[in-house]
Amino acid sequence: VPDILKQSDGNLIEVGTTNRTHLSDYEKAILDKDNCAALILRAHHSNFRIVGFTTEPTLIELVALGHEHGLPVVDDLGSGALLETTSYGLGHEPTVQESLSAGADVVCFSGDKLLGGPQAGLVVGRAAVLTELKRHPLARTIRADKLCLSALSATLMHYLKDEAVQKIP
């Protein structure tokens, strides 16, 4: 994400500290006139854990804050589970559905990894925001090709038929 922001002339505004971030840290960054915040990004820490004296705002709190200030909220889930992982003896991973239900405007996740489909970056969310993304001149250069879309469609069909666990390796 930092490299993408650098290439796009975006500015990543870090808030809080490694183990303690409060909603007020986000609000201070939003209200700082030097920052020009354009969105709130929450990135799920899927491959590490911070334990001990920690705190961070919930996605619901971030969505309320973002919308209060007219900012879209992007939730980058990384792996992107569609099924509850605790049912399989794993720790809880936030699902795409949970992020959307919490009100995130955009949810980003992988097509492979936990989903079990082709390697791809997937973006779901509010139609108005996705329409804006599609209109961007670079959207054409990063869209999925027909083969990738076909494989993704087949994978998602297993989820719709409630057979993903049996059919996806």
Where are these regions (language model features)?
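Conserved PLP-enzyme active-site core in the AAT-like
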Residues: 1-159
